[in-house]
Regions:
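Positively charged n-region of N-terminal signal peptides that target proteins for export
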Residues: 1-4
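Surface-exposed acidic, glycine-flexible loop patches that form ligand/cofactor-binding
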Residues: 126-132, 210-218, 241-244
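Short glycine-enriched nucleophile-adjacent loop
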Residues: 231-243
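A conserved short beta-strand
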Residues: 244-253
Length: 253
């Protein structure tokens, strides 16, 4: 029985890996703005593109204000649409969060030890064309909460093969994501929690609740799923009162 179960698990993981492929497979594809993907959101009017397999894709969506300067080591604040208005092309994923180079990232420049930028709270969305009330799958990447980024994974196959809207996000990592010190105390429970990476994920879910219907997703049918550290972060979503009502199912690997 154990042997059979092991085979089933391996086959299942291989299948998931095929459906949720690495974005590296799309390097030769050059995205072009598609007017059919224009969507109005709380982050502004977003223009995406049609992916190689037909999925509609929006990359580099700012879901929270840049956690820099006075917002470093503070709870995330919602992103706002630019005052000047206009259309924001979302063809390229946003910055990775600061981290050491790894197998999950690009190499560092010769003059830098780390990669990424503090201005990194971005998400990518993948949806079947003309989707309506489709289930939403909200991905939390792994990497020990110190490395990785949401854009390392493309949700195009998952969206097209299973009729779901896939959301992947970046969240703060390492000392920027989980850190507390008496000198940072403000008296605000969220700001003083030290759990900034967790709060980023919750802010991402709040953005989904307010906007995903415009992408064909159902805000009342949201599944959070993650692997490794992303699985632990998924458990944190299940445990946090702040995430209550923001999602309805969870998958932990």
């Amino acid at each position: 029985m154990k042997k059979i179960l092991g085979i089933v698990v391996v086959v299942a993981l291989i299948g998931i890996g095929y459906q949720f492929q690495s974005s590296e497979e799309e390097e030769e594809f050059v995205p072009k703005p598609d007017s059919a993907t224009l969507r109005k959101t709380t982050s502004g009017s977003l223009l995406g593109y049609t992916g190689a397999n037909g999925a509609w894709v929006w990359r580099g969506i700012r879901y929270a204000k840049a956690p820099t300067g006075t917002l470093r080591w503070r709870a995330p604040l919602p992103a706002k649409a630019p005052r000047k208005g206009g259309i924001i092309e979302t063809l390229v994923s946003g910055n990775a969060c600061p981290q050491l180079p790894s197998a999950l990232s690009e190499p560092a420049d010769e003059d830098r030890v780390t990669i990424g930028e503090e201005d990194c709270l971005f998400m990518d969305i993948y949806a079947p064309p003309e989707a309506e009330k489709a289930p939403v799958m909200f991905w939390l990447h792994g990497g020990g909460n110190t490395i990785g980024q949401g854009s390392s994974y493309s949700g195009e196959n998952l969206a097209m093969k299973h009729g779901v809207v896939v959301v992947t996000i970046n969240y703060r990592l390492g000392i920027f994501g989980w850190f507390s010190h008496p000198s940072l105390t403000t008296g605000d429970p969220k700001d003083d929690s030290g759990n900034y990476g967790t709060l980023d994920a919750i802010q991402g879910l709040q953005w989904v609740q307010g906007n995903i219907e415009n992408f064909g997703g159902d805000p009342n049918n949201v599944t959070v799923f993650g692997e490794s550290a992303g699985g632990v972060d998924t458990l944190a979503m299940m445990a946090s009162p702040l995430a209550e009502g923001l999602f309805h199912r969870a998958i932990v690997q």
